Regions:
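Short, structured beta-strand/loop micro-motifs enriched in basic residues and often containing a Trp
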Residues: 1-10
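A broadly conserved detector of short glycine/acidic/proline-rich loop/turn motifs that flank catalytic sites
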Residues: 10, 30, 65-67, 166-170
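C-terminal binding/interaction regions
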Residues: 26, 134-188
Length: 188
């Protein structure tokens, strides 16, 4: 487990170099979407339409930020529960998206897709939306404005603190932590 500063895009090579448990400070362009936005994007793909952004090597942050205060780039921007995107994540990875930022566990189907497409799941700290917003230097609404907080946005972040929860080989920090605890403490 390392502490690393990485710059996007999240290429296949960069994704493969990350390991579950790595502390990462992320800099570059990311996109925001939650379940309503993911549903629309997957429906568009099913109709053969283009997405509102190029998904190649993209990282998607599962967030619905609050409105920005006067003079601020964005409001509070904490992660939402990633499981709500599990039905859509394999499709998004199949068209090139590689990174996902959120909180909580992922279904085995998502982990299988991550192994197939060299995806990485980063965990952001829940409840720290105001602090995470300080890492967001630019925010631009790009699609689905009618979804309000769930609209798609393009963000530029600097040194966003994250942890690799699941790496491109399927290693899962949550499972590793449980196994380590049981090894040390047994089934008590």
């Amino acid at each position: 487990m390392e502490r690393r500063h990485i710059t996007l895009p999240l290429t296949k090579e960069l994704a493969r170099s990350l390991h579950a448990g790595d502390q990462v400070y992320l800099t570059g362009t990311i996109y925001t979407s939650r379940d309503a936005g993911h549903k629309r994007m997957c429906e568009a793909l099913a109709r053969g339409e283009q997405l509102p952004f190029d998904p190649t090597d993209a990282t998607i942050y599962y967030v619905g930020p609050t409105p920005a205060k006067p003079g601020a780039v964005i409001g509070s921007a904490g992660p939402t529960t990633s499981g709500r995107m599990d039905a859509y994540a394999p499709t998004m990875m199949s068209v090139g998206a590689r990174g996902m930022i959120g909180k909580g566990a992922r279904l085995p189907e998502v982990v299988d897709a991550m192994k197939k497409y060299d995806g990485v799941y980063f965990g952001a700290i829940g409840g720290a939306g105001a602090l995470l917003a300080k890492c967001i230097k630019k925010a631009e609404l790009i699609a689905y404005e009618d979804l309000g907080a769930e609209a798609l946005r393009k963000l530029y972040v600097e040194d966003m603190p994250l942890v690799v929860i699941i790496d491109s080989e399927g290693n899962n920090l949550y499972e590793m932590g449980k196994a380590e605890y049981l090894k040390e403490h047994g089934d008590k």
